[in-house]
Amino acid sequence: MLDVYSGSVHAVDELAYAAIALVDAGHPRAEAADLLAKKYADHPEVTAEDINDCFDDIEELKADGKLFAEDIYADHAFDFKNRSTVVKALCLHVAHTCNLNCEYCFAAQGKFHGQSGLMSFETGKRALDFLVEHSGTRHNLEVDFFGGEPLMNFEVCKQLVAYARSIEKEKGKNFRFTLTTNGIGITDEVIEWANKECYNVVLSLDGRKEVNDRFRKDIAGRGSYDRIVPKFQQLVKARGGKGYYMRGTFTHYNTDFTNDLFHMADDLGFDELSMEPVVSKAGSPEALTEADLPILFDQYELLAKDMLRREKAGHPITFYHYMIDLAHGPCIYKRISGCGSGTEYMAVTPWGDLYPCHQFVGDPDYKLGDIWNGVTNTELRDEFKLCNVYARPDCKDCWARLYCAGGCAANALHATGDIHGVYEYGCEVFRKRIECALMIKVAESLDPELAGRAATAAPATDEDCGDCSSCE
């Protein structure tokens, strides 16, 4: 049982669940106890003392702020339009071109429905300077080499990292680079560079060969699996434990996506995994449907149970969407406002234009400005400042609202025409993932062996609030 505002998760039996439900419905203690006594009259194992102890526990948890906690977040949401404009991360589109032609790609072969192009070193350098200039006192700055396919502009990627390293000490910053790649352009040089300079790498693979090659093809229509898998394996092996993710997309054609995850884990040797539902126009052959949802829910449950099995066997895998920290979770600000697109996080095109994130690139209505003049469309930025869970009435009664912070603005726009809208299909999937993530945590806490391992895991120490004062 999840207490929404405290974030506490309680493992309860049937009696406790019924007691909490009665309290939640407004029944006084004596009345609720009488109702439970009648309900369990034919269950001699449930005594009056058990019922009394149950309500004692409920009152103690309420007093400790771990059950029926009050909403302490709403007061932080109303003034978001006046929050700071510190920028902490950039998605650098170093290449608006690609050496694959994935049929489900929202970026239209990396061109984002515009012209192809490569970012120059001068433009990239100015983008890094823009980030430093607008980062305030924040120390850690995130930069993702993105596209298109960023390795089609590898020399500029190398030059930009070298430039960033040359100014880190002087500016008091630490640049953390991520490379997102389809793998076609990986070479020994790329592997050496990425494993030295990149805090994380994101490797695009949809799973089984036939699944991957259905959509992830080159211009000639040839599948990419056989060319990229050996390169990915070589890169991951050489990383020596540094961060990476296998990032797949599942569609209507592989709603059995756990088989793709298990293939990557068992057959290919990858243990850091992510799988995202395709976002396509309704009616597209690959688009997920309402009829797919029960299948997807079963798949997420199957994955969660299998992850527990693997953990007990000493061969755990990580699934990105099940990574949840109940003891050291996000701060209030992040719980409310999410990813920070359009404010703290922006995408930069090869020509230096600024957009709220990569999914808005190419839409003139969502151009924020450029890296030379900064954010000139301040009205649009103010709209993104207001993107938070309390700005979405449809989120009001959702138990998962403080885990998604209102969801993705781009998905909301594409589904409803409004960045403050709600992409309901995505909500259904998200809630199921959080449910499974919480189940894993509860199962770990109830298993002595797994609980011991969890207790020895280091808490997150990567928080860098910089100039953010939203929690104060």
What spans do the regions from the language model cover?
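Short, small/polar residue-rich loop motifs at catalytic or cofactor-binding pockets
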Residues: 339-342
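Radical SAM/AdoMet-radical enzyme domain recognition
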Residues: 124, 128-144, 153-278
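Long, K/E/R/D-enriched contiguous segments that form extended
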Residues: 258-332
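Long, charge-rich, low-complexity alpha-helical segments
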Residues: 8-91
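C-terminal accessory region of radical SAM enzymes
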Residues: 294-328, 358-405
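Canonical Radical SAM [4Fe-4S] cluster-binding loop centered on the CxxxCxxC motif
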Residues: 84-85, 89-122
